[in-house]
From Swiss-Prot:
Spans through the membrane: 186-206
Keyword Transmembrane helix tagged: yes
Species of the source: Mus musculus (Mouse)
Protein name per Swiss-Prot or TrEMBL: Thioredoxin-related transmembrane protein 4
Entry superkingdom: Eukaryota
Principal location class: nucleus
């Protein structure tokens, strides 16, 4: 009887103790996370000191698996002398565009404004060795236009921020208001067209304000001056061509006259040469005749009449042949 009474008493005492312990644990405050959330307003903190950043999304299973490891890594941040942060790409699409995050989870190391992509697993031991052994020094940094602090990535952040706002607005239409998705798409198409027309109108107004049109009279004068200038230019070109033609004709005429004069000079020279040759031949014939006469006087009676008349005849034939050859040569030169 006593044993049966003790069992319920012990059970009641154990339940009371468990309830009291649960109340004490509930009364204790939750342990504060050492991971610092990063937003578009405070992300510049990573430009100073050494940081490790994690980009995640609440719906990403891989991101959820590394949450506990990331918290452990953040708790030991003081020992490692490093700050640990995280970025929710759903709430901060601009930062995901600034770091050009395309896969989740994504990890980045920052040292005095120089960023590097960490591509290892999100396990505490690997993260700790990455910092202690300074493995980040062997990783190529994001420099130039790839750097999150560059002007290019600032523009990319603006584009991602606008796309995030459009996505939130689409969810508001389809989830909160219950509007069909195709109605939301039609709304965005119309809004895009209206925005384009509005921007075009603004550009036209700006051009009209800053680019003052010329008066009509001045524009007509400019056109007349331009037409007269073109006509004068055409006339000058025509005159120049005519002058060239005239000069070419005069040159041709002068060249023809010079050729004719040269031909006449050549003919006169040939005639003079022929006269000189004829005179020379006549002198030769006279000398030969005188020689024959002298020989005839010396050798009177010793030479027969046939021999006496044969020698002058032979010399005369030779002279005539020479004259004929000379004339034929001159005729060939003239032709």
């Amino acid at each position: 009887m006593t044993g049966g009474f003790c069992v319920p008493v012990l059970l009641a005492a154990w339940l009371a103790a468990a309830a009291a312990e649960g109340l004490e644990q509930a009364a204790l405050p939750a342990e504060e996370s050492r991971v610092q959330p990063m937003t578009a307003s405070n992300w510049t903190l990573v430009m100073e000191g050494e940081w490790m950043l994690k980009f995640y999304a609440p719906w990403c299973p891989s991101c959820q698996q590394t949450d506990s490891e990331w918290e452990t890594f953040a708790k030991n941040g003081e020992t490692l002398q490093i700050s640990v942060g995280k970025v929710d790409v759903i709430q901060e699409p601009g930062l995901s565009g600034r770091f050009f995050v395309t896969t989740l989870p994504a990890f980045f190391h920052a040292k005095d404004g120089i960023f590097r992509r960490y591509r290892g697993p999100g396990i505490y031991e690997d993260l700790q060795n990455y910092i202690l052994e300074k493995k980040w020094q062997s990783v190529e940094p994001l420099t130039g236009w790839k750097s999150p602090a560059s002007l290019t990535m600032s523009g990319m952040a603006g584009l991602f921020s606008i796309s995030g706002k459009i996505w939130h607005l689409h969810n508001y239409f389809t989830v909160t208001l219950g509007i069909p998705a195709w109605c939301s798409y039609v709304f965005f198409v119309i809004a895009t067209l209206v925005f384009g027309l509005f921007m075009g109108l603004i550009l036209v107004v700006i051009s009209e304000c800053f680019c003052v049109p010329l008066p009509r009279a001045s524009s007509e004068r400019c056109e007349q001056e331009q037409s007269t200038g073109e006509a004068q230019g055409a006339e000058q070109l025509q005159d120049a061509e005519e002058e060239k033609d005239d000069s070419n004709e005069e040159e041709n005429k002068d060249s023809l006259v010079d050729d004719e004069e040269e031909k006449e000079d050549i003919g006169d020279e040939d005639e003079g040469e022929e006269d000189e040759e004829e005179d020379n031949l006549a002198g030769i014939m006279a000398e030969e005749r005188s020689d024959t006469n002298e020989r005839a006087v010396v050798k009177e009676g010793s030479v027969s009449p046939k021999e006496d008349g044969a020698h002058p005849a032979d010399t005369q034939d030779v002279v005539e042949d020479a004259l004929r050859q000379r004339k034929s040569q001159n005729a060939n030169k003239g032709s």
